[in-house]
Amino acid sequence: MELLIMIDAFKRASAKSVTAVIPYYGYARQDRKTTGREAITAKLMADLLTTAGANRVLALDLHSGQIQGFFNILVDNIFATLVLVDYMKKKNFKPEELCAVSPDAGGVRRARYFAKEMKCSIAIVDKRRDKHNEAIAEYLIGDVKDKNVVLIDDIVDTAGTITKAAN
């Protein structure tokens, strides 16, 4: 709410342009209906930011690419994996000692990017959910034995997914 108020204040003070910088896009996981009578809150947030007067949004690791399509203004989706890759390269990690692991199928693209840039192997945890926010790691696809594992995820909420993937 404070971001919306600030954007409105800037526009009322004759700001030529306002870029909303959003490190964490709240409600990003509500990007589609999963049951009847459910709001698509990620779209509502996009509408509110636009109505408040934002001309551009700079976001970090949006949960899904379709969120960019919810806006009628420019959206830059910056990937934190770029920073991680840069750090790992500077620390001279050996590719044969690393394995990029996605804790679920939805994060494979991020893990694949990291693996490609670091020239290392990749693994994927096949995750299922039995209840809301309760993940169960079922199978590991790939080999992580004797590797330094880099678990790559976009949102850590309860840390259930990433903890179970690590175990």
Predicted regions and their residues:
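PRPP-associated nucleotide enzymes
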Residues: 1-167
